[in-house]
């Protein structure tokens, strides 16, 4: 059981990292700073940084907000997640 829990934790970390990579990639493609994305999504710049590095798990509503601001389909952000 402990091994399966470790696998699940590792899988979640990889998925969060991939989500963060996708968000950062789209943000940079739009030439937005973390600060500007934070302003437009009403979250802190630190939270944007933590999301982009996979250190926190944003709510689905926050991911939808980010997708809207970046003008991309949410599926682009959750690709390979």
Regions found by a protein language model. Give the residues of each.
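Short basic helix-loop element that most often maps to the first helix and adjoining turn
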Residues: 21-40, 65
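Conserved hydrophobic/aromatic packing and binding residues within compact polymer-binding modules
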Residues: 23, 37-38, 48-51, 77
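A short, Lys/Arg-rich alpha-helix, primarily the initiator
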Residues: 3-29
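Short, basic-rich loop-to-helix N-cap that marks the start of a DNA-contacting helix
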Residues: 55-65
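Short C-terminal boundary/hinge segments that cap the last helix of small helical domains
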Residues: 71-81
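Recognition helix of helix-turn-helix/homeodomain-like DNA-binding domains
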Residues: 42-56
């Amino acid at each position: 059981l402990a091994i399966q829990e470790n696998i699940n934790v590792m899988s979640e970390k990889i998925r969060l990292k991939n989500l963060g990579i996708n968000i950062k990639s789209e943000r940079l493609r739009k030439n937005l700073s973390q600060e500007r994305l934070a302003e437009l999504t009403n979250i802190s710049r630190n939270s944007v940084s933590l999301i982009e590095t996979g250190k926190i798990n944003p709510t689905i509503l926050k991911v939808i907000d980010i997708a809207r601001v970046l003008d991309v389909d949410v599926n682009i952000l959750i690709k390979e997640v």
